[in-house]
Design a protein with these regions (language model features):
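Metallo-beta-lactamase
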Residues: 5-9, 103-152, 211
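Short N-terminal or domain-adjacent regulatory/targeting segments
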Residues: 225-252
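Structural motif
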Residues: 45-47, 75, 137, 161-164, ...
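Active-site metal-binding motif and surrounding structural segment of the metallo-beta-lactamase
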Residues: 44, 55-102
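Active-site-proximal loop/helix segment associated with metal-binding centers of metalloenzymes
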Residues: 148-152, 168-203, 247-251
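Active-site neighborhood of phospho(di)ester-bond hydrolases with catalytic His/Asp-centered motifs
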Residues: 49-51, 73-81, 101-104, 163-166, ...
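FMN-binding flavodoxin-like domain, especially the glycine-rich phosphate-binding loop
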Residues: 175, 186-224, 229-231, 273-289, ...
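Conserved beta-strand hairpin/beta-sheet module of binuclear metal-dependent hydrolase folds
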Residues: 4-65, 154-157, 161-165, 267
Length: 400
């Protein structure tokens, strides 16, 4: 039995949900699964927008067949060639051998690398501003390189004013029946996972996202259909504003992310005491993370949310605690910029981590490391409270 959803009189969702997956891209925890979205548009000609992960090809083709309702497929629009979206292309072509594939020139090259069928005889390479008429619906192709692969484009349907946005505006998480964002009561949970998705999957490519947003600003958009998660038909300015902030590395809130690496609890205590002192200074929505318990993707997402970060690490084998080292290098790799940072180090005989953490932060753009820091020798002493107060004062001042 098929599982398709009618979005408009002519547009159908034919995607799938994956609740068995534990790690997206074999890296990122997805406790609520993933959706792989695909869409069928019916007109005088028919079009399928992207495919799905290879694990779900059978169910996906059932959905496509049901949406086409006895018709053939004229066009396969390939916005993105990452395998969670392109893996079923060969199966679609086998089922609909007359279908033409519309994609960028770079996508043609990638398709030849992934598949063995004759791509050239089927491909229609498109460039910026090219159009394709399906009848009463006209598609315009908008190039979106490095959002987040080089071959990416998005497709705008101008009659119903729908943007097929590839990986942009997506989120972690399967679709739980309610396929439209306005059907979800808990937008806070969605936002948290959307932020984590953006910052970890697309976050490095902020300038490219900014370029796409500028192009999108010139389009009248009534619906956004991403390749992951829910579809947007309301609150589009709110959604786009989030992307404007994230892609420009602008903090959402003037508050603090605290991450600590601790073995026996002494550095953890320092992080907790500092968090309390920051709260006493009127700072709200502080986050505190144990880098050994919380996956880096959650901490990276929170660092994009906040304007200041505190890194508290023990000295471990003469260096930064291993999980803290991973977090710092991941933050650098994801391009986070325009933040204030503060450091706490702990070492029983040779505390070295403030210098080492500072060196990693120094490779990042516009990260201001506060001069006030705290060195713990094994355990905090009562006479160090003034140092924590000074650090809290400096952090609070940076938020003004």
């Amino acid at each position: 039995m098929n599982n398709i959803r009618k979005l408009t009189d002519s547009l159908f969702w034919v995607g799938v949900n994956d609740r068995r997956i534990a790690l997206f891209e074999n890296v990122y925890p997805v406790p609520t699964g993933m959706s792989y979205n695909s869409y069928v548009l019916l007109d005088e000609k028919t079009a399928l927008f992207d495919t799905v992960d290879a694990s779900f090809t059978h169910d996906f083709l059932e959905n496509v067949t049901a949406a086409l309702n006895g018709r053939t497929l004229d066009y396969l629009i390939v916005n993105h060639m990452e395998p969670d979206h392109c893996a079923s292309i060969a199966n679609v072509i086998a089922a609909y051998p007359e279908a033409k594939i519309v994609c960028t020139a770079k996508a043609v090259g990638m398709m030849k690398q992934f598949f063995d069928f004759d791509v050239d005889s089927r491909a229609i390479p498109v460039k910026e501003g090219d159009t394709l008429s399906l009848g009463s619906h006209e598609l315009t192709f908008v190039m979106a390189p490095m959002v987040h692969w080089p071959e990416v484009m998005v497709t705008y349907e101008k009659t119903e004013k729908i943007l097929f946005s590839a990986d942009a505006f997506g989120s972690f998480g399967a679709v739980d029946g309610n396929i439209f964002a306005d059907e979800i009561d808990d937008k806070g949970t969605w936002l948290s996972e959307a932020r984590r998705y953006y910052t970890n999957i697309v976050g490095k490519f902020g300038m490219s996202v900014q370029g796409l947003l500028k192009k999108a600003a010139g389009l009248e958009i009534r619906m956004i259909c991403p390749l992951h998660s829910v579809i947007w038909r309301e609150d589009l300015p709110w959604l786009i504003d989030k992307y404007l902030k994230w892609s420009s590395y602008t903090p959402e809130e003037k508050t603090v992310t605290i991450a600590y690496g601790s073995v026996y609890g002494h550095t953890e205590k320092a992080a907790d005491i500092l968090a309390g002192k920051l709260a006493d200074r009127g700072i709200r929505h502080i986050s505190v993370f144990d880098v050994s318990k919380t996956h880096p993707s959650y901490i990276i997402a929170d660092a994009f949310r906040t304007s200041a970060m505190v890194f508290a690490s023990i000295t471990y084998n003469g260096g930064i605690f291993c999980n803290m080292d991973t977090l710092l290098h991941q933050l650098a790799a994801h391009g986070l910029t325009n933040r204030t940072a503060a450091l706490i180090q702990n070492g029983t005989w040779a505390a070295t981590t403030s210098k080492q953490m500072g060196e990693i932060l120094g490779t990042m753009k516009n990260i201001h490391v506060l001069e006030a820091d705290v060195t713990i020798k094994s355990a905090l002493k009562n006479d160090q409270e003034a140092e924590l107060d000074a650090l809290a004062d400096a952090i609070a001042a940076s938020l003004q």
